[in-house]
Regions:
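Conserved SGNH/GDSL esterase-like catalytic core that processes O-acyl groups on lipids
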Residues: 2-92
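Alpha/beta-hydrolase-fold catalytic nucleophile elbow
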Residues: 61, 111-112
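Surface-exposed, active-site-proximal loop segments in enzymatic domains
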Residues: 68-82, 119-129, 170-174
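Alpha-helix N-cap and loop-to-helix initiation/capping positions
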Residues: 77, 81-88, 129-140, 177-181
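A structural motif corresponding to the C-terminal end of an alpha-helix
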Residues: 92-110, 140-157
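Acidic carboxylate-rich catalytic motifs and surrounding loops in phosphoryl-/glycosyl-chemistry enzymes
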Residues: 112-114, 151-171
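Substrate-gating cap/lid alpha-helix
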Residues: 118-158
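Histidine-centered active-site loop/cap adjacent to the catalytic His
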Residues: 146, 155, 172-200
Length: 200
């Protein structure tokens, strides 16, 4: 069984019977480490873990909201570089990832962040990066997340290179709206997962 825990991008796996979905609305990679947050993501993760059995796989799908909204905002407010801010997020996110794997005798995999999307500042955030800025943030985040996964023996699922154009933006054929990837990405993710788990 593959449990998918994540944000709204995780919903694309629902049509495939190999996947079981779990996750709150709009969770972030940063917020997953908070005992108390609006999305109750850590609480819901712990609830899901009661259903996970030995040798099950948990696929984490988090970070898109961090990269689209929060990293740029913190960059403006604090003057810190994208790299510094991403490092802080991944430290927190990574701590939970390793705890889940080590404490529950299960396998974990981490999906990278999808490419920058068309959506502008429709929610009127006080600070919101351009599409190029958001593409740079996603690239930095994915680079650091991949390094973390390699250093800790975690399966890193690379979707971004398959569905991004030369500017690091989401290709039209993989977009279902101005924010989300389409179901067309699921076979790619399965193919990438099989590199880590050949019997999948």
């Amino acid at each position: 069984m593959i449990f998918v825990f994540g944000d709204s991008h995780a919903g694309k796996f629902g049509a495939d019977k190999r996947f079981t979905l779990c996750g709150p609305p709009a969770p972030t990679a940063y917020g997953l480490a908070n005992e108390k947050n609006k999305s109750e993501s850590l609480f819901l993760l712990r609830q899901m873990l009661h259903e996970v059995e030995q040798n099950d796989i948990i696929l984490f799908v988090l970070g898109e909201i961090d990269c689209r909204v929060h990293v740029f905002r913190q960059h403006v407010l604090t003057g810190k570089s994208y790299a510094e801010i991403c490092a802080g997020i991944i430290t927190r996110y990574g701590r939970i990832l390793l705890a889940v794997r080590n404490d529950n005798n299960c396998e974990i995999a981490v999906l990278d962040v999808p490419p920058a999307v068309k959506q502008g500042n429709e929610y009127e955030y006080d600070f919101y990066g351009s599409r190029n800025e958001r593409a740079s943030i996603a690239e930095e985040f994915n680079s650091q997340l991949e390094t973390f996964c390699k250093e800790n023996g975690v399966c890193f699922v690379k979707l971004h290179p398959h569905i991004s154009d030369e500017w690091g933006w989401l290709k039209e054929e993989y977009s279902v709206d101005d924010v989300h990837v389409s179901e067309e990405v699921v076979p790619i993710v399965v193919q990438e997962l099989q590199k880590c788990f050949p019997n999948l």
